[in-house]
Amino acid sequence: MIKKIVASTLLIIALCCAPFTLFAQGAKCTISGKVIDQQQAPVAYASVAIYQDTRPIAGVVTNNEGKFSLQANLSTTEHRIAVEFIGYEKYEGFIVPNKAHIDLGTILLKEAAVEVAEVVVTGKEVAQKSTVEHTTINASANMTSSKGTAIDVLRSASSVSISNDEIAIRGNKNILVLMDGVPTTASDLSTIPAANIQSIEVITNPDASHDAGGTGGIINIISKRNRAEGFSGMVAANYGFNHFANGNIALSYNRPKTSWRFSYNVKYEDDVVNSTLNRKVHSTGYAVFQQMQSTRYTFNNNISLGADFRIDPRNRLSVDAKMIIPRLNIKQDLHNTFADHTEVRYNDVTWNRVNVEGSVAYTHIIKPDVSDITLRASVSKIWGERPSHYFVGGIENNRSVSGGSPFIPSLQADYKRKFSIGTLSAGAKLTYRQNDVYHEFYELTNGEWIYSDKMSKDMLHTELTPAAYAMFSSRIGKKFTYKVGLRGEFSTTTLNSKHDAINERENDFFVAPSLSGTYKVAENQDLSLALSRRIGRPTYPQLIPYMSMVDATTYEQGNMHLNPEKATKVDLSYNLRTEVVNLFVNGYLNYTTDYISQVTKMDGERLITTYANADKDLKTGVELSLKITLAKWFNFTAGANTYYVTTKGVFEGAHIDNSGWTNNSNMMLNFTPWKGGDIQLQYFVTTPQYYPQLTTSLTHQMNIGIKQRFFKGAMTVSVLLTDALNTAKWEVWSHNNLFDLKNNSKNKSRMLWLGVSYNFNSFKQRGGQKTENDRSLIRLGM
């Protein structure tokens, strides 16, 4: 009943804006069709409207069978037809009403990635939605996201584990990061504010249309876009006690033909991390107990600009530019206790970066609702520098300066064509990746700074990857749909180092097939299967060859000679949807060869943490998502990911072995006890995780948030307590053939946050226009 009232109200609003000539007499064209969802079920009470330019001229809602019929005056000009329903992506097509009857057949509505809707007071937002291929996380459904970064948004996905700000999908850290679907050099997700994020897609089993990179999967960050007509905006500020603050402003101006958007975000933090470390090397008997206090100063600025141009009903152009300017300074006080002496050290390390992103996308609709082509171009560039100073006993005895300039441009073309038997998608992409790295290390000798040739390094790495794909999707009968695809990528990699006299070139061809299918067991139940092949090319932190000093005997260094890892992925899922319960269960198997792993080896008396290719890595597990809506004022969401991992390999005498069971779970309770108010309780727990040579300990934390809306939802005030029980920590231990280790650290995780945001004009609609936010008012599910 509520759906019917909402749909009818939206339709009445749209038609009230149509001129009275709508009812003029004349020859008519009858347009009919049927609206269905991805499960082939009819969509009742969907609104269907016909537009001439931007003016609505006719409209109707679908009946219980999803069918509709409406009339428009006969015309030789092109008209736009729009079909909308809450929780689904808007469908748009074009027709020419030049005959007595036009049958549009079936119109498919796809479930929408939920838009951010901070001021909506008539319903609840969907926290996340899962399929056999991916999970979509709604950023604003999580209260902790308002003060945080992309990492805070990702915590709510059980497939994602976060340890010491390192991200893994189902235990694999080799992840491809995209911004609005295009490659980015901004792999540090802690620099991307959640205030700018609409949603994040965690793609665990990508099809052939996606880049084959990232054996762990793909994280696609989708930026906010306000589609309300006219001028609107939002300002927000959050303060965490003590010394954590961030602010955000977002503006948009939308007209029928153009849209403009701007956002700016600033963040300041000074965090204190206290750590202890016990380590003993078997071969030398060397043992140390280390106490360290690190103060982390973070100052980030993010600016984004964008515009959309609806040139005509068949042609659209989008332009976006982003600039991320992160500044990070870490000051470390270390107290080392050895068997025969003690040592006091002090490190001062600064990261300065400027990251620029730009993209252009052009879409041409060749034939409405039949074929289209999209062209995309993007560029991502970082200018980075890292000056470091190392002190012993209050005297600086080492210093270094290093930097790099990762650069990723790409060109892409995608074509889609619908046939009576199915849909064909095809495309081509050209991606170039380059990083020019230098590291200069100096030692104080007899009062003079002497360049260390042994500790200094350089590297120029390039990678050119042309790719092409084709994919076909269709159905067999009324209950089974499938999608089959094939992608080929040919990469040419060069590696140059003047210091090490290296000049290498390597070619590699990788074939990435994909297959997925869904069988509709019942009206509200599905079984799905997905298979794919992936390749994980080494990331720049894994490749960079220079040594970074941790202490007098411990260093970190990349490995220029890593091979790509290759993975086979299989997923089988079951989905049940009712008005009260939404259940998603997914079993998976990931088998990876040449698995890229972090490993610590001996180099004389030094321990060097680097990266190496293990022989193989196998992960098999079950992922579960559950949402229960017991009442309008209360719902419960839970997620769990349990898997068994085993890794095998040897690198320069170090065993790259480990195995064990791991569980990553989360729970969220949502209450709406009064009008405009929300109370949210979150609980996260991660059991020990098993990595080659290392095992992390169990960790858990609880967050509690309260949010209240004022002035008809335009203003929101929030109070948030993170890690209420003060249990969040990072602890790792190891007992291997080279050394024993136990390391733990604790930062300012329990914090009280106060936040306020104000939206102006964001949801004042003109005429019959409807924003994307309307879709999330009633829709339930994951």
Task: For each feature predicted by the language model, list its residue ranges.
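Extracytoplasmic beta-strand/coil segments of soluble accessory domains associated
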Residues: 151-183
